[in-house]
Amino acid sequence: MNINMKDNFKKWLDLQQKKTLLKFLTCGSVDDGKSTLIGRLLHDTKQIYDDQLFFLKSDSKRHGTQGNEIDLALVVDGLQSEREQGITIDVAYRYFSTNKRKFIIADTPGHEQYTRNMATGASTCDLSILLVDARKGLSEQTYRHSFISTLLGIKYLIVAINKMDLVNYKQEIFENIKKDFLIFSKKLANDLNIIFIPMSALLGENIVFKTKLMPWYQGVTLLSFLETIKIKNSISSEELRFPVQYINRPNSDFRGYSGILLSGRMHVGQTIKILPENINSRVSRIVTFDKELKKAEIGESITVVLKDEIDINRGDFFVNIDSILQPSQEAIIDIVWMTDNILLAGESYNVKLSGKKIRVYIKEILFKLDVNTLKKVKSHSLVLNSIGRVKIYFSKPVIFDNYSENRMTGNMIFIDLLTNITVGAGMIVNSLDKKGKIPSNKQKDFESDFYDLIIRHFPHWNIPKILMKKVYK
């Protein structure tokens, strides 16, 4: 590689690093054109290479739905069962980049039985594209996906009214769907940002290039909006949240605390508070794998060295010196249930919260949510793909935020005790403890550990629920 090529490659890398990243998902009813939309975005931004096009043409002849034309939906419908049925089952992730921004796309299933897949895709996204068939208008799945998107903290919605070519590009149809959705959106979060774009994913109209067939629409194309939208972080994203994931002690002269800076900023010389012990200290060094930093930003993997020798454990939190965050042992959460095994009050699970694994007890199922009507339904159980609100009790005090304030420190996954399979995803609504640090209770800790022993090695005894009521009463 000559010097000019090296310089050009370095400039290209520098340019890529300076681009902002937007993560978004597509969702909607079955066959509204989600996969076709992504295929069109990739095709018209020249992200599909010649060899991919060759295989795409071949696959289109076997599994395509567009006759002799290339079926762009096959770009993301990767599973054989998806291609044969013409539907999306799994969450398909794709990456592409333009001159202005980098993107990660999650193409999520439209079928109700794949709600858990859709929730998985939405959990890491900043924006949601809701596909609506112009011929059919809003559907129950549109309502469901809108709610799940907002439940998982997404504040930006693009209502993509697709297949306008099949309704002769009539403005009246577009306006009616827009009106219906705005009425429905009043049931969702109050701080949503909603935009409506008429388009045809199949023909590429208003996706990357502006169409002349809808002169009544004076807005931007889909890509133009995605390239320019500025995602505003929540208020708590300015609050320092650094959970310790690893105690880094390679030799007797170095003791650091490694993890990912989930929110806020940190700099050398900063005075911080360590929770749950409520001890203050000062940052003396910030180290990465190849250099030292004066300051660290959100998302960076760092090792922090403190001025003082303090007993710090995995799962402890570094927060701002004036933070009012305190440990809590009881919370109300929204949960998406992801397994065939029914969730019942009295059960216990492991949860992973901010990198820390801890036992929780399901104290009460408050209600199940009908995601098609958004009505609260009284229920004593949650089944696969159900969404509900439950009250939980942690075996020990833990640190967390409300999910609406900080998605990174307000989410958890539920893990089955026996199989170690992920069975649910939880979003913390609020803490039920308002008294600050909770003192240790050795008797409770012993009973909790004793229960762990029984549930793991003697499940056939059939007594865990009775014991748990005693442990967490």
UniProtKB/Swiss-Prot annotation:
Residues 19-238 form the tr-type G domain. Keywords: ATP-binding, GTP-binding, Nucleotide-binding, Nucleotidyltransferase, Transferase. Residues 107-110 are annotated as: G3. It is an enzyme of class 2 (transferase). InterPro entries: CysN_GTP-bd (IPR041757), CysN_II (IPR044138), CysN_NoDQ_III (IPR044139), G_TR_CS (IPR031157), GTP-eEF1A_C (IPR054696), P-loop_NTPase (IPR027417), Small_GTP-bd (IPR005225), SO4_adenylTrfase_lsu (IPR011779). One of its GO terms (biological process) is sulfate assimilation. Heterodimer composed of CysD, the smaller subunit, and CysN. With CysD forms the ATP sulfurylase (ATPS) that catalyzes the adenylation of sulfate producing adenosine 5'-phosphosulfate (APS) and diphosphate, the first enzymatic step in sulfur assimilation pathway. APS synthesis involves the formation of a high-energy phosphoric-sulfuric acid anhydride bond driven by GTP hydrolysis by CysN coupled to ATP hydrolysis by CysD. Belongs to the TRAFAC class translation factor GTPase superfamily. Classic translation factor GTPase family. CysN/NodQ subfamily. This is Sulfate adenylyltransferase subunit 1. It comes from Buchnera aphidicola subsp. Acyrthosiphon pisum (strain APS). The lineage of its organism: Bacteria, Pseudomonadati, Pseudomonadota, Gammaproteobacteria, Enterobacterales.
